[in-house]
């Protein structure tokens, strides 16, 4: 089911290695990370199968790859500005229409306490992982903008004429902030890496199916390009999902 011919689905995955979770569970803070490396790996979807995925850009933990585990990531270094942050984030590589790669400049991860004030925000448990984004979230929980503008459903936007500091194309993802409990513990993963988490509302909180309030995460990826409309940008995943044209995506 294709929603738009130029719909570009940005999907971001995260393998979270908690750092001082009790200290940060009810705070707001920002983690700023540089681009780490690029590889055809996905340790969540294709664990222990190097080269099985389309190309991804990796941020944060420098060791992330097909064989990454919770323990291996704890021992690795990070390129983030917060000491002890060993979480990993990755997204499909952004391409120009001529086939060249657009390298991201940096990624910012915004952590904040949960939806409803006064309710406990549970820290992420060890080895927590999830995937966010895709065709069903585009325009609401994910999309593209020029740093502060409204979300667009396509990466083909022009930020070149905007004010200083707002001239870079950005991909934005909001992760689900509600989880499930099983046998007294927070569920850390699911078969599709999505169904163990859900989105909630600032009015009603978390849904009954996923009553555990988790830290809310928003990810902003700033790319080294101002005019993706002229460059005819698309994600490499668009070409792997059966899209009829570059920039058009179908869900996995």
Where are these regions (language model features)?
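C-terminal segment of classical bacterial N-terminal signal peptides
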Residues: 14-22
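Bacterial N-terminal signal peptides that target proteins for export
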Residues: 1-9
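Primary mode marks residue(s) on the alpha4-beta5-alpha5 output face of response regulator receiver
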Residues: 26-53, 57-173, 180-252
């Amino acid at each position: 089911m294709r929603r738009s011919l130029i719909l570009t689905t940005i999907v971001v995955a995260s393998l979270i290695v908690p750092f001082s979770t009790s200290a940060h569970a009810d705070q707001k803070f920002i983690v700023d990370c540089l681009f780490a490396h690029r590889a055809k790996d996905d340790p969540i979807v294709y664990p222990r199968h190097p080269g099985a995925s389309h190309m991804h850009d990796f941020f944060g933990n420098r060791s992330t790859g097909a064989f990454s585990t919770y323990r291996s990531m704890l021992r690795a270094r990070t390129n983030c500005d917060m000491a002890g942050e060993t979480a990993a984030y990755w997204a499909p590589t952004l391409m120009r229409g001529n086939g060249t790669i657009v390298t991201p400049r940096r990624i910012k991860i915004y952590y904040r306490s949960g939806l409803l004030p006064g309710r406990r925000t549970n820290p992420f448990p060890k080895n927590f992982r999830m995937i966010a984004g895709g065709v069903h979230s585009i325009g609401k929980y994910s999309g593209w903008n020029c740093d502060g503008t409204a979300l667009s459903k396509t990466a083909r936007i022009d930020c070149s004429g905007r004010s200083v500091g707002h001239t870079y194309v950005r991909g934005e993802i909001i992760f689900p902030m509600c989880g499930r409990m099983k046998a007294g513990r927070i569920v850390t993963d699911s078969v599709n890496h999505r169904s163990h988490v859900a989105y909630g509302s600032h009015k009603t909180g978390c849904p009954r199916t996923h009553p555990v309030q988790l830290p809310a995460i928003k990810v902003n990826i700033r790319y080294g390009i101002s005019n993706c409309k002229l460059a005819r940008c698309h994600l490499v995943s668009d070409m792997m999902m059966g899209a009829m044209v570059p920039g058009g995506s179908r869900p996995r």
